[in-house]
């Protein structure tokens, strides 16, 4: 299956668009509202993450998930994080166009062009604070040109969160499988996706789908103890009154 879409904007315009996207995402974990498809009835042009019954992931609009490393637990959209542990983020991508529309007879409308991905996560969470991990996919020739989703994390204790260097990797069934991704993933520019190379071209069909993974480490934050209350000063004892004079 395949889906294609064009969006000819410069990096500055992309940054402005992302600001609007991430601010509007508070109302919806995913967005924008868009037509949906099924595995039996995929799209007839390039479009990302809009199939609702994907056998691998379910509803593709829910495409950002997180799990604790080596926990044996599945990826989820909501997780409690603890200090001094590693977590792995998964961002799924799929051009939902039917493969038929990749050929020249159909003007290659199944191809998505200039496909980029970016992700953002909080640097610090206070105890009990809930934060979000954003995943965003943009293209230059699809409608919508940008799709996004969020996973949510809640801190059991106060923590900082840091990217584990060189953990970002693309996984798929094509030549780019296993390619490490730069930290541009965490900027408004993002990183290019691709199949035979990371050139931004993603044909339609599930055989060209994939995931981007990266890891986050949490570190406990030392909390200063409440200061000891200062003792109240001991009041001076009542002064001894002067003796009354003897009567003459």
Descriptions of predicted regions:
Residues 223-248:
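Ser/Thr/Gly/Pro-rich low-complexity, disordered linker/stalk segments of secreted
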Residues 6-17:
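Sec-dependent N-terminal signal peptides
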Residues 1-3:
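N-terminal secretory signal peptides that target proteins for export/translocation
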Residues 18-21, 27-229:
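Exported/extracytosolic protein signature
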């Amino acid at each position: 299956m395949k889906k294609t879409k064009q969006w000819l904007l410069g990096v500055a315009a992309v940054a402005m668009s992302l600001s609007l996207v991430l601010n509007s995402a508070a109302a919806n974990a995913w967005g924008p509202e868009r037509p949906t498809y099924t595995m039996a009835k995929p799209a007839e042009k390039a479009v990302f993450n809009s199939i609702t019954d994907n056998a691998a992931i379910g509803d593709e609009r829910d495409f950002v998930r997180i799990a604790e490393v080596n926990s044996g637990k599945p990826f989820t959209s909501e997780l409690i994080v603890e200090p001094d542990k590693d977590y792995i983020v998964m961002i799924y991508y799929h051009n939902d166009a039917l493969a038929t529309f990749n050929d020249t007879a159909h003007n290659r409308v199944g191809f998505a062009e200039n496909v980029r991905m970016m992700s953002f996560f909080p640097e610090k969470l206070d105890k009990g604070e809930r934060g979000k991990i954003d995943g965003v996919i943009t293209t230059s020739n699809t409608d919508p040109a940008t799709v996004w989703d969020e996973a949510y994390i809640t801190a059991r204790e106060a923590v900082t969160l840091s990217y584990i260097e060189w953990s970002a990797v693309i996984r798929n069934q094509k030549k780019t499988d296993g390619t490490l991704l730069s930290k541009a993933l965490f900027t408004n520019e993002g990183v290019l996706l691709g199949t035979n190379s990371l050139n931004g071209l993603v044909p339609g069909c599930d055989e060209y789908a994939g995931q981007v993974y990266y890891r986050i480490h949490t570190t406990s934050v030392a909390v200063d103890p409440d200061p000891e209350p200062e003792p109240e000063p001991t009041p001076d004892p009542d002064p001894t009154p002067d003796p009354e004079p003897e009567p003459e």
